[in-house]
Amino acid sequence: MAGAWLTRLLVVGLVLAALNLRPAITSLGALLEEVRDGLHMSGSVAGVLTSVPPFCFALFGFAAPRLARRFGPGAVVCAGMVAITAGLLIRPFAGGTVGFLAASAVALMGIAVSNVLMPVIVKRYFPDRVGTMTGLYSMALALGTAVAAAVTVPMTEALGGSWRTGLGVWAVLAVLGVLPWLGLVRERGAAAPTSPSSSSSPSPGIPAPASGLRLGRSRTAWGLACFFGLQATGAYITMGWMPQIFRDAGISAGTAGLLLAVTMVMGVPLAFVIPRTAARMKNQGPIVIALGLCGLSAYAGLYFAPAEGAWAWAVLLGISNCSFPLALTMIGMRSRTGAGVVRLSAFAQSTGYLISIPGPLLVGVLYQHTGGSGLPIALMATFLLPQMVAGVVAGRDRTIEDEARMRD
């Protein structure tokens, strides 16, 4: 009975954690113009601001496996939720640009370690339901992203019109995300219920490092890292700049936020369907291509008719952004062991986020120097081409252990 209760608590914890992994970013995107005015930011500095998420995800993502082995994944995710809460509370009232960036980094540190450990926890405690559980928390992640994009502007207006209040209120959701993990870390093993696959692990919290795996020599690992990095580039540019692109086309701030919400809410059903579908396929390349073509169509529409077809472009971008749950699913499928997934998740996500850092910076610079969205949109479309190539490589029916044996 206790084991069943802990399993349910773990599912609740995964869902609430996932709900908190994007509001810190999408709420800022909805109010970016107001934040820029309030903090006197240039376009280039705003580009730096939208590059902070992937930088923090890369930096702290590399540390996640070591922290999880030391303290247990549940304790690390719990600490991550606390960091998100603290960062969201402090950020709006931190003073100038430097304080705003520092508080954002605290929240993003918590998001980073949780990002890496989600596939690990799913593989460890739900080894026979990787697609289903990945879909569940990906759906929750998309829901949190969409809700933050949709309600931040109207909620800010309802609370008095201050962007500081509109950003800070998301700390309430983060507090809720802490609660189930506090219960989980109090249990022996500081993680969650046991599973058949976990009894052979030398650590109560997480498998020991997989020996003999040189991910730097694995085409699959690099394919996943590049695919993850390029889809993250598009996602963070979308979350940071899409409302501004629509506002430049003459669309109101509230409607621009709703358009971003439509993009994000597309991930709610698709983030559940795509992982389940991908888990049943030996090769995920066709899904990669289909999502990429949706993205290219959306960028073409944004370039030639941003206002006239705004809702259609938002829907197509939302479909394209489901490359994220697909990447998480492939991480869980491209290793035979929990220990391998730990290393592959950290490598693919941290390396991927490093790859994604220049994208938002380039968009900010191009936006400032051209005064329009044309070149940034063209750049975003260009990124999709290597993303599709990398995704096809990552989607092949092989594991990192298979590649290691072939090299030996």
Features from the language model and the residues they span:
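Juxtamembrane intracellular "pre-TM" segments in multi-pass secondary transporters
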Residues: M1-A4, R186-L224, D408
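Extracytoplasmic gate region of multi-pass secondary transporters
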Residues: L28-G29, R219-V262, G267-P269
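Cytoplasmic helix-loop-helix junction between adjacent transmembrane helices
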Residues: A103-L141
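A late C-terminal transmembrane helix in Major Facilitator Superfamily
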Residues: S335-S373, M380
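Helix-breaking motifs and short loop linkers at transmembrane-helix boundaries and internal kinks
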Residues: H40, G72, F93-V98, P127, ...
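Conserved MFS/SLC helix-loop-helix module at the cytosolic interface between two early adjacent transmembrane helices
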Residues: L59-V98
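Helix-loop-helix hairpin linking two adjacent transmembrane segments in secondary transporters
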Residues: D128-R129, L136-G189
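C-terminal transmembrane helical hairpin of 12-TM major facilitator-type secondary transporters
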Residues: Q284-A327
